[in-house]
Amino acid sequence: MRTRNKIIKEVIQCAEENGWHVDAERHQDKNIVIFEFSQFTPAGQDFFFSATMQGRSLESLVSDMEEYYEGFDADSEAYLWLDGNGHGKNGAPYRMKDVLADMEAAEGMVCKLLEAVRGLAD
């Protein structure tokens, strides 16, 4: 059986091999590890999300990542980056379709990472 530290190292290595930066914050009192995954989207947005691992259960991390991925709505995320006229704001691409394409790319990035981390459980 793998130790929690070994699992953490494997997750970090897997994510980094897939182009992600990872911070892992251990909460000993709650017996959890919170992973924060970040990567730039094709349009340059610093995209990130967090997922939690319970104890040394890689399956709990995969489950939390699946929940995030399944709940990710590229349209809603794109809307957050649009101004009142439907143009990108805060460094987002100017055209609405480009903002949406960037959020769809982010969704694909999460999917690819999820598949890679899921592969660690095999």
List each model region and its residues:
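Intrinsically disordered, low-complexity regulatory regions enriched in serine/threonine/proline
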Residues: I32, D46-D122
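Negatively charged, low-complexity tracts enriched in Asp/Glu with abundant Ser/Thr
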Residues: M1-A43, G119-D122
